[in-house]
Amino acid sequence: MKSIRYIASCCLTLALATTALAQEIRSNAEDSFITKPNGSREVDFGATIHLDSKGYPMLESLETIYDEMDYQGAVSAYLQAMPQMNLFGSLKTAHYYGATGNTDSLVMHNDPSVDGMLTPNRVVTYLMNYANLAESGPMVFEQPAGATAGLIMDMQMRWHADTGLTSPYQGKRVVKYLVLTVDQELPDGINKNKHEYVIVRIRTNQVWYVFRNLDPVKNPDLEKETNIYPYSERKEPKPNQFFQAKKSDKTYFMAQPIGMAYWKRLHEYIQIERVNEADRYMMARLKAVGIEKGKDFNPTPRQIKILKKAALVGEKMAITLSFAARSQSAAYRDDSNWVHPLTLDPSHEDGPIYQLEQRVDWTFEAYGNSLVMQAGIPGEGSTYLAAYRDAKGRWFDGEKEYVFHIAPNAPAARFWDLSVYRMETRGLLPF
């Protein structure tokens, strides 16, 4: 017991000595680093924090500081979860229209589902599938030959493969993609040398398989030549089901929900997904506001207050990043208000950092990501330009009319399209 007391005493003495030393060092530093704590010193964290004469927070201020910590952590988590909530909303759309099974696909073309998509166009037909590999085991996706362009991505919208015309196979033949999670074993009997399958490993439980039928007038049912099945059923795969919204159906909006609904959906997503290494700090932040893996979401009144404020501020930050990006690579021309909305690397990495702002910028309003979506050369893929303000720099206003000037000989090998979207949903405006 004596030794314990002695150690504690030494630690206390060391702490006091360190404080005194810091005071001495600071007093000899440049003016910008001088700190003279006193009882009247205040820090604005949205609320005033009083410090005592030693520079410590007053005891009655501790809860206010923790409130601010949890609020800032929730805002950070809100932004970090943007692509997950994007694709989880897309999955919810598929389920809403009936495509709930691992081999079910949602077909979207000239129907109410298209109006609820994030920034689509009305030219192509979309096919989407969300298989849960934790349930099904490794899955096979047979991409049909023909004029399609698609992607295989994980639920954080990280690229894993291009399919169709923009793949190395250029849509000339059926290609079998064998998709596994990073920890699933390669099935017995796979001979990599025979190239029967393109092997794709993803870092989430669910995979997003999507492609566009680029010429639905010429080949209206090309997407239904897709074949999806668990590898374990490859010898006798079951027929796929293709679902499409009826003209009389309501529109399901896949955009990220707002307010507390955002956090409820994020909690739901976390329960069925694995935690990636890069997510662990976010998970710690979420735990402080009542969102944990394996536990129900029952936030306290204090946590609800923090979450509501964080959702409001997080959404405004996302709008700012998406509609007024500060990334230099977003600029199209110095004399134009048009921008490149997609500046996110397919890996979400840029040297030593993750591209947080570029990730929020793109995934708040759109989905899909690949180098071929940033091609810049006709015939090599696609390129996207966006405008949020008029020629005088004013935000677009739905109550006003605008004239869109198109230069002759638009550089497009297959087609170009102009679409107009609502700010609230990032969905198409009705005709």
Each PLM stretch: what is its role?
Residues 9-19:
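Bacterial N-terminal signal peptides
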Residues 1, 17-23, 209:
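Generic low-polarity alpha-helical segments
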Residues 23-431:
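A compositional/structural signature for long, glycine/proline-rich flexible linkers
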Residues 1-10:
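Bacterial N-terminal signal peptides that target proteins for export
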